Swiss-Prot record:
UniProt KW Cell membrane keyword: yes
Record family assignment: Belongs to the UPF0161 family.
Protein name as annotated: Putative membrane protein insertion efficiency factor
Transmembrane segments: none
Keywords: Cell membrane, Membrane
PANTHER family: MEMBRANE PROTEIN INSERTION EFFICIENCY FACTOR-RELATED
SS bonds (residue pairs): none
Species in which this protein is naturally found: Streptomyces griseus subsp. griseus (strain JCM 4626 / CBS 651.72 / NBRC 13350 / KCC S-0626 / ISP 5235)
């Protein structure tokens, strides 16, 4: 359902919008806002955001910059993700010592003073 709506907005932008000229009081324009919101949030929520934007775009509105809100993940998604990460367990690569039995001599970086300025 998302792609037919996006096609209708593009059709409007290519045919009707050039005839009307720049009449939108907001940046980005209402049609660009609608395209982005439907593309980002899907057909239902994107259409609702677009309808609310078109209702706000009127001669009594001051206008201004109004970007599409970012997509938010629901709270249950974050809890589930954290629970799954906790179940994996095990040690990370940072916790495991390197497997070399031969110790390497300290390099030149270990010999320099911490206040030295390098090139």
């Amino acid at each position: 359902m998302k792609y037919p709506l996006l096609a209708l907005i593009k059709l409007y932008q290519w045919t009707i919008s050039p005839l009307l000229g720049p009449v939108c009081r907001y940046y980005p324009s209402c049609s660009h806002y609608g395209y982005t919101s439907i593309d980002r949030h899907g057909a239902i929520k994107g259409t609702a955001l677009t309808a609310w934007r078109i209702l706000r775009c009127n001669p009594w509105s001051p206008g201004g910059v109004d970007h599409v809100p970012p997509r938010k993940r629901p709270r249950w998604h974050e809890l589930l993700r954290n629970a799954l990460r906790g179940e994996k367990g095990g040690e990370s690569a940072a916790d495991v010592p390197s497997g070399g039995s031969v110790s390497e001599p300290p390099g030149p970086a270990a010999e320099t003073s911490p206040n030295a300025q390098g090139a």
